């Protein structure tokens, strides 16, 4: 169970880093938002899901 928690935390950190870089780039590029809207929403949905997963796994471990 600890391995799953550590992998979920790593995935959350990696997703956060990718979103931290990609979202400003999408907003700064011309026509970037209209063509990459689905990618940003998918990344945000993945991030929210990982936050809940880390919270659930943390409550099971502690």
From Swiss-Prot:
The gene is psbZ. Keywords: Chloroplast, Membrane, Photosynthesis, Photosystem II, Plastid, Reaction center, Thylakoid, Transmembrane, Transmembrane helix. One of its GO terms (cellular component) is photosystem II reaction center. This is Photosystem II reaction center protein Z. SUPFAM superfamilies: PsbZ-like. Gene3D superfamilies: Photosystem II PsbZ, reaction centre (1.10.287.740). The keyword Signal does not apply. It is a multi-pass membrane protein. One of its GO terms (biological process) is photosynthesis. PSII is composed of 1 copy each of membrane proteins PsbA, PsbB, PsbC, PsbD, PsbE, PsbF, PsbH, PsbI, PsbJ, PsbK, PsbL, PsbM, PsbT, PsbY, PsbZ, Psb30/Ycf12, at least 3 peripheral proteins of the oxygen-evolving complex and a large number of cofactors. It forms dimeric complexes. NCBIfam families: PS_II_psbZ (TIGR03043). It comes from the Eukaryota. PANTHER family: PHOTOSYSTEM II REACTION CENTER PROTEIN Z. May control the interaction of photosystem II (PSII) cores with the light-harvesting antenna, regulates electron flow through the 2 photosystem reaction centers. PSII is a light-driven water plastoquinone oxidoreductase, using light energy to abstract electrons from H(2)O, generating a proton gradient subsequently used for ATP formation. The chain crosses the membrane at residues 8-28, 41-61. InterPro entries: PSII_PsbZ (IPR002644), PSII_PsbZ_sf (IPR036512). Its main location: plastid. Belongs to the PsbZ family. It is found in: Plastid, Chloroplast thylakoid membrane.
